[in-house]
């Protein structure tokens, strides 16, 4: 019998066996080859010693219960190794099933997070008890990595909750529940408040249920809510894929489709066949490119970014105690709330007490909503609000060890507000400017301590957007960069680090996406087709509606400033076909965007979109083309948007504005809505059909048809010729 290396067997004198999950080679337990072998050995021993066993408790020696599949293994799966993955997965499922049907009570004592494979192990137990530990989460988030639960999660949640609830509450959204919410939604049976109580409750269940079995193994069991064999359920079945398509906007996310198929098909067959169906759909996803893209971005890249891969080494952390937020408008109010929520005292300053109080009112509104929805208590909300002091008096900023300026995008105004307070705050206070486009090096000229000056580009709405783009100016010191990084992590956001340049990374690259969509309008392409192309490419916001939200005048202002800067430096402005469209929209038609009541869309008196402006078809046509929407392939529309952002990102690497592939991928997804299925803007190139050579060939084809802006940069061509990928691996 194979020895168990990752599962410890502990048996007391009452006949209760505790299986302690404890991989000696990892900080967290995962469903790797060592676990598979250990599970097989443990299963054989349980069956051999069945008569001396009264019950089984499954728990963990780690801080978390079980972390799920080993993503380092899964990201390497190819069609050639798919059979090996299928066989290994089925072996795990068979052994969990053998334990589940052993005829003894089996209890999962979840001492920490049980996500993915961890919750699937718990599902194979007859009773699930979760410790109400801080940060503990329960659920099946595989869909967020382009996968489905492949260890029995689809099969068992469908039989536990029914097809509809399993899909909506667990599988399709990847929801991660706190222990108490997991209990409310039927994912666990009990919640314990201490580790001792956790084990005591597990033993109590064993004592009370000596002949326990799963509900679905009892004679006459029916899946809650019915199956497609039920005419009433079958009549509603066509709504499932329709709803799914609406949820994804038709973007190429294969995981939700496979989850739906595995759930519905598995509900119509016996348990073992359902397990095989689930396994095949899982392996199809694991061997595909989308899951590799999403695992790279949402696990490996995100982990690298948040762990400080780009934080200067050897500099001690200095948590911010008191922050001054200059400007109580939309951005300043959101920044103040985010800081106060993280436990930092905030002085929110504006030019008048009324303006400052209005900024605090934003936090009051958010807190009231959170209390009404049960997401916080009134006591916690009051404590958060007490940390925000609105003021118009600069002297109240005394003692602040960090400053975040969030006034209007005007260099002279930003200089003025810093000069007003730089001698009042702490003498070594970190000085941060929230700007989306203005060069940080020039802004730093307005303060005396340029070494402590840095850019923090927050995204709107600040309380919801997880990313902050940190911009290092030419004279920004390493200590300021480290402190800024730590401040972003302190307020529980994800920091990416870039070097100074007009537009930095995110603002410059999203501009390419917008320009390409607008350029297509100028070519006479049906505007609704352009919007649909963006949606089906996976963008969360359609390109023309996004342009209206930003206003047409802002990009034009930024373009004119950038053009002037390039020409003053002796360069040549490249221009873009979108510029003529924007100029006509503003100057000829007076359509400046949503705030002006008219843009690419019409708006009603309440500011609600009333449809695309019919004048777009009338005023923008391509000469000699009867129907550009027919002559320009839909795939070209999508890839023009995707490629425009990817190619400009490579240029930013060439220019040294970007220094990290992980920062580029995470920044593009979390900051500017690059489609998640791609794994980010550079992983999109890596994962493109044919790899980098395939991407280069396609870029050249687009350049030949649509303009030299699609010509692949030298760095991309060089990497393609060398057979390399975009990676931070040294």
Regions found by a protein language model. Give the residues of each.
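Short glycine-rich donor-binding/catalytic loop of glycosyltransferases
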Residues: 132-137
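N-terminal glycine-rich phosphate-binding loop for ADP-containing cofactors
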Residues: 10-12, 22, 76-81, 86-91, ...
